[in-house]
Structure formats: C-alpha cells, structure tokens
C-alpha cells in the first residue's frame, strides 16, 4: 500500500472519531472506529466500527451527511469520500480463537 493512501486512511480514521464524538446521539458518540479502507480512487471509504448492535448501522447511515460535513470542515479537503459503515467482527473472531487455543492447551495439560 502506498504511503499517501495510508496517511489518508489514518487521517480519516481520526477525523471520523472526532466527528462521532461531536454528535448529540450518545450511542453514536461512544462508538469506536477501528479501521478505514479507502478505495483505489479514494471516492469511497469502508469504515469499520466496533459495536454489537446492528441497528447502529442505520443511525450511522442517517448521520453520514453530518459526519462528512464535519470531516470536510476539519480537514480542509475539497471532497470527502462516500462513507460505508460496517460492523467490525474481528474482536469476536479473536475471542473465539483464544477460546479454541485455551481448550487445546487444557487438552495437552490433561494428557
């Protein structure tokens, strides 16, 4: 990945965290953005958020205009990518893997 794209994704991640924190909705401003992936043309960004509630995605979609406006004002960019929000399930996967490894370790200890 090139350095420009990495820098853009990093900046966008920070700006999105600030944008969510500035919203009046307590569910949205407590969300954590874990990762941002920009498309090759940088017109679209996939935003991974840490939440177990699927209803939060509809709230984020409704607030997308406010979030993009905040990003534009805070960054000074000419254009903000279109944001698509996705629930980040990597933590759940990691916890499942840890549980499996713990079971394997217990099985070896019992032998």
Swiss-Prot record:
Compartments, as annotated in UniProt: Cytoplasm
Gene Ontology biological process terms, A to Z: maturation of SSU-rRNA
A GO CC term attached to the entry: cytoplasm
InterPro entries per record: KH_dom-like_a/b, RbfA, RbfA_dom_sf, Ribosome-bd_factorA_CS
Keywords: Cytoplasm, Ribosome biogenesis
Main location as per UniProt: cytoplasm
One Pfam family, short name: RBFA
Assembly information from the UniProt record: Monomer. Binds 30S ribosomal subunits, but not 50S ribosomal subunits or 70S ribosomes.
HAMAP family registered for this protein in UniProt: RbfA (MF_00003)
Annotated family: Belongs to the RbfA family.
Role summary: One of several proteins that assist in the late maturation steps of the functional core of the 30S ribosomal subunit. Associates with free 30S ribosomal subunits (but not with 30S subunits that are part of 70S ribosomes or polysomes). Required for efficient processing of 16S rRNA. May interact with the 5'-terminal helix region of 16S rRNA.
Entry protein name: Ribosome-binding factor A
Annotated organism of origin: Helicobacter pylori (strain J99 / ATCC 700824)
Lineage: Bacteria, Pseudomonadati, Campylobacterota, Epsilonproteobacteria, Campylobacterales
């Amino acid at each position: 990945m090139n350095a420009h794209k990495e820098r853009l994704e990093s900046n966008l991640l920070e700006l999105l965290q600030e944008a969510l924190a500035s919203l009046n909705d307590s569910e949205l401003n407590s969300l954590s953005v874990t990762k941002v992936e920009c498309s090759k043309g940088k017109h679209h960004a996939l935003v991974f958020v840490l939440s177990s509630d699927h209803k939060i995605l509809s709230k984020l979609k409704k607030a997308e205009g406010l979030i993009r406006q905040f990003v534009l004002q805070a960054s000074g960019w000419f254009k903000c990518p279109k944001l698509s929000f996705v629930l980040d399930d990597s933590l759940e996967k990691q916890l499942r893997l840890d549980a499996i490894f713990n079971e394997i370790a217990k099985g070896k200890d019992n032998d």
